[in-house]
Amino acid sequence: MAPVGDKKAKKGILERLNSGEVVIGDGGFVFALEKRGYVKAGPWTPEAAVEHPEAVRQLHREFLRAGSNVMQTFTFYASEDKLENRGNYVAEKISGQKVNEAACDIARQVADEGDALVAGGVSQTPSYLSCKSETEVKKVFRQQLEVFMKKNVDFLIAEYFEHVEEAVWAVEALKASGKPVAATMCIGPEGDLHGVTPGQCAVRLVKAGASIVGVNCHFDPTISLQTVKLMKEGLQAAGLKAHLMSQPLAYHTPDCGKQGFIDLPEFPFGLEPRVATR
């Protein structure tokens, strides 16, 4: 981490990766803030960015001081359709725009305390699971993208996708911004929920415009690396290149099925015995 107050021009994400740097991200916001009483289990939505900005800011700062090079906006499940899902009505009470704007402002404030970049993130949507059209789903992503562009995030992440088709739509929507795009799927070695292999998922994401591809959230570090290896092999076989990314779950999941930890009987409140300690 750069010294606090260092104001040198920051290198972009691709400049860092192309030079051989290993870039460390942050993560785990939803679970960490749920345990601290700021996120409601079930909806897992990020209205705390508006209602409790000091809590979100503090967690960003903890990641920065631990060595993170990227502050990811706390916009997981911050699409308009998700914010009004499951009776939570955040979109009605606050508005998706305010949640996304607040998350961007907090991430930038903390990133500028060091040499960190800000990544604006979108994730899977209820619209896709409700079988809405590609046009309708992309519209949801573009609503968040408008805020990310207004707040001038450094790059974009499409994360936590169980279906590669939706992930491709997200990448295509984000790529129109002209900013670098990373894409991660919450899959294991068996692939996405339609049976598309990790290698093919990676190929489709890169062809859609992602410069960085990988996995996140549903499986532990060991299984996540196995899956990333399959992605790498798929890209090599297709003659494609991309940087690789892994944001594993911080719980051991050797006995999980295709959907990872969410299928465990311990999910979500009894996972502590599975914690992957330092």
UniProtKB/Swiss-Prot annotation:
Entry's EC annotation: 2.1.1.5
For this chain's record, the cofactor binding note is: Binds 1 zinc ion per subunit.
The organism's lineage?
A: Eukaryota, Metazoa, Chordata, Craniata, Vertebrata
Spell out the GO cellular component terms annotated for this protein, sorted alphabetically and separated by semicolons. cytosol; nucleus
Question: Which Gene3D superfamilies would you find in this protein's record?
Answer: Homocysteine-binding-like domain
Q: Which organism is it from?
A: Sus scrofa (Pig)
The record's subcellular locations are: Cytoplasm, Cytosol; Nucleus
Biological processes annotated in GO: amino-acid betaine catabolic process; L-methionine salvage; methylation
> Where N6-succinyllysine occurs, residue numbers?
40, 93, 98, 232, 241
InterPro entries recorded: Betaine-hCys_S-MeTrfase_BHMT, BHMT, HCY_dom, HCY_dom_sf
GO MF, any single term = betaine-homocysteine S-methyltransferase activity
Activity regulation information from UniProt:
Inhibited by dimethylglycine and methylthioacetate.
What is the protein's name according to its record? Betaine--homocysteine S-methyltransferase 1
Q: Where is the Hcy-binding domain?
A: 11-278
- Which keywords belong to this entry? Cytoplasm, Metal-binding, Methyltransferase, Nucleus, Transferase, Zinc
